[in-house]
């Protein structure tokens, strides 16, 4: 069926509602390499994001790590621990569904200051254009 063609288990966000929150989608670096993918990992700490600092100093704990295919810039996975990551993961879910690249993520305009800038920063860092790290 068409629904099963669209459904991909790897594209389902996994969320843990603890303090801090944890969220992931897709493969981590080890899983990508085991699958024979030439992958790289990019990490951005929340302490680099202004909104995380001005909202509450405890919000600046944690990080986001993106796994990207070196050959075609495809976002293979994302792991996050920190403030509101169970909300932030949805942007990556949509981007993966639409076969978006890390560059497209980085060039997407995000409100400033906002926690979602962490994923924009990941996309920029993956392409050597980071602003905050």
Feature-to-residue mapping (PLM):
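N-terminal periplasmic "start-of-domain" segments of outer-membrane beta-barrel proteins
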Residues: 8-17
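Flexible, glycine-rich terminal cap/loop adjacent to redox cofactors
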Residues: 18-28, 33-133
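Short, small-residue-biased leader/transition segments that mark boundaries at the very start
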Residues: 1-7
């Amino acid at each position: 069926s068409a629904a099963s063609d669209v459904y991909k288990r790897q594209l389902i966000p996994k969320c843990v509602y603890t303090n801090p929150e944890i969220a992931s989608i897709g493969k981590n670096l080890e899983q990508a390499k085991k699958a024979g993918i030439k992958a790289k990992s990019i990490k951005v700490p929340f302490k680099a994001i202004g909104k995380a600092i001005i909202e509450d100093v405890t919000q600046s704990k944690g990080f986001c790590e993106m796994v990207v295919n070196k050959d075609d810039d495809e976002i293979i996975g994302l792991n996050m621990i920190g403030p509101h990551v169970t909300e932030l993961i949805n942007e990556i879910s949509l981007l993966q569904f639409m076969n978006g690249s890390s560059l497209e993520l980085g060039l997407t305009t995000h409100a400033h200051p906002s926690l979602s800038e962490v994923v924009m920063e990941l996309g920029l860092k993956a392409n050597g254009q980071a602003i905050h790290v």
